[in-house]
A protein has these predicted regions:
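Surface-exposed strand-loop-strand hairpins of Gram-negative outer-membrane beta-barrel proteins
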Residues: 44-65, 103-118, 259-290
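Outer-membrane beta-barrel "beta-signal"
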Residues: 216-235, 405-416
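Residues that define the transmembrane beta-barrel architecture of outer-membrane proteins
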Residues: 32, 58-64, 84, 120-128, ...
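Residues on the lipid-exposed face of transmembrane beta-strands in outer-membrane beta-barrel proteins
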Residues: 64-72, 128-136, 148-152, 178-186, ...
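Outer-membrane beta-barrel translocator domains and adjoining extracellular loop/strand segments
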Residues: 48-54, 101-107, 157-165, 206-213, ...
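Transmembrane beta-strands of outer-membrane beta-barrel pores
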Residues: 40-46, 70, 92-98, 150-158, ...
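Repeated loop/turn-to-beta-strand initiation elements of outer-membrane beta-barrel proteins
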Residues: 75-77, 140-144, 188-194, 230-233, ...
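Transmembrane beta-strands of outer-membrane beta-barrel proteins
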Residues: 34-38, 86-90, 144-150, 178, ...
Length: 416
């Protein structure tokens, strides 16, 4: 994300200053620039479907966090004012998921898998995240809005055949973190304030390894904040940089990586205990590629919306065909698939976040397609477009079905 640029401004006249002081933004006491905080979270891990319900024993979670926030005061590029002077933050979160227990009890549903005599757990998850908090309402001693988080997480007890065999939530030590929350904050005195978040947090490996169920939790969070600065006032009369609405084309090419749910199901439930691959924690990764052509319309400084065509190349489908056809599968197989998608992008300076909702026009990935995929797909990610690159950009994202990762990708793009 980009920081606000500091500019000098001429002093306000007394009438203008009086008029300005009547606005909610200037009356707010939440404009001291730098804040440190600490807090606690207590919540529950969500059970997402009937399959997970069959082996979840308990879901209690708790945690602590420490963070630093920088409140945006003013910026001549206009983004700060457009987002109502947001806050940027860096937070270290430590979540204790020892109270989350998983265990498969004897059932014919598990095929050849032999239940074990202990419960599995994700242990603790440490996350280092960047956050963006946008105030929707700010006046006097109160501030309310929404916040988004992205970062990297480390899980102390991922899935392991030897000692954590029923942990299907976290498949590796290193995970991707995403969070979203609604928040309210109240000023207590000159420097202290309280902030409460109703937070949803997700960590997973983005289909880069198995298992890939992901850990989803609702975590009410309370933070005690301390402002390091004496005062700060947004310079709301700073002239904004000019902005011109307009349409543009963009082409993106990306490569991604994924593992196969077919490998997971085969080794978990269709492999005898005497086989070396029985309930293994070693999985092969497969490469995928994608090409996108989009027509977008930038109708506001911070937003663009449009329609795009997506072409996917998934050579792992040939591997599935070679495995499944000899077993009697009559499903269709193709390494190529395509779709169209509605695309929306939110900008702040050189960075943007995107979300796509697409529908396949054709896709044939074998007998597991109806179980593991949907006719529609989602894609979320972040993009960096430095001005000196003359329209070139780099992006990192995840494509998913029903919010479950299909692959994680890295790509380049060009717009004109």
């Amino acid at each position: 994300m980009t920081c606000a640029c500091v500019v000098a401004i001429a002093p306000l006249s007394l009438p203008a200053a009086q008029a300005l002081s009547e606005t909610d933004s200037v009356k707010s006491t939440f404009f001291r620039p730098t804040t440190v905080e600490g807090g606690i979270s207590v919540g529950q891990v969500l059970t997402m479907d009937r399959y997970q319900r069959a082996w979840m024993e308990s879901a209690a979670s708790r945690g602590v966090h420490w963070g630093w926030r920088r409140r945006t005061l003013f910026a001549p590029d206009g983004y700060a004012a457009d987002y109502n002077y947001p806050e940027w933050g860096v937070t270290l979160q430590m979540m204790d998921y020892a109270g989350v227990k998983m265990r498969k009890t004897p059932s014919p549903d598990w095929g050849m898998a032999v239940p074990v005599d202990y419960s599995s757990s994700p242990g603790a998850v440490f996350s280092l995240v960047g956050s963006f908090s946008r105030p929707l309402f700010r006046t006097g001693k109160w501030q309310m809005g929404y916040a988004l988080e992205e970062g990297l997480a480390f899980c102390t007890r991922p899935y392991a055949k030897e000692h954590n065999i029923d942990n299907e939530l976290t498949g590796g030590h290193w995970l991707i973190h995403f969070g979203a929350s609604l928040y309210a904050a109240r000023r207590l005195d000159k420097h202290w304030s309280l902030r409460g978040d109703l937070a949803f947090r997700h960590v997973s490996n983005g289909a880069t390894y198995r298992p890939n169920k992901g850990l989803n939790a609702v975590l009410p969070t309370l933070s005690l904040q301390y402002d390091l600065d004496e005062t700060g006032t947004p310079q709301v009369n700073v002239p904004k940089a000019s902005f011109v609405k307009g349409a543009f084309w963009r082409i993106d090419a990306s490569v991604g990586v994924r593992t196969l749910i077919e490998d997971w199901l085969r080794t978990q439930y269709a492999t005898p205990p005497t086989d070396a691959e029985y309930r293994t924690d070693h999985f092969k990764r497969y490469a995928v590629a994608n090409l996108q052509l989009d027509r977008m319309y930038r109708y506001a400084r911070r937003w663009a919306t449009g329609l795009g065509a997506d072409l996917f190349y998934t050579p792992y489908v040939r591997t599935l065909q070679n495995q499944e056809v000899p077993e009697g599968s009559t499903a269709k197989y193709s390494c190529w698939s395509g779709g169209i998608a509605l695309k929306h992008e939110a900008y702040y300076g050189d960075f943007s976040a995107y979300v796509h909702l697409g529908m396949y026009l054709w896709r044939h990935t074998g007998k597991m397609q109806s179980f593991d995929e949907t006719p529609y797909y989602e894609r979320v990610g972040v993009r960096w477009t430095p001005p000196r690159w003359k329209g070139m950009s780099v992006q990192f994202g995840i494509k998913a079905h029903r919010l479950k990762a299909d692959f994680t990708e890295l790509g380049i793009g060009f717009q004109w």
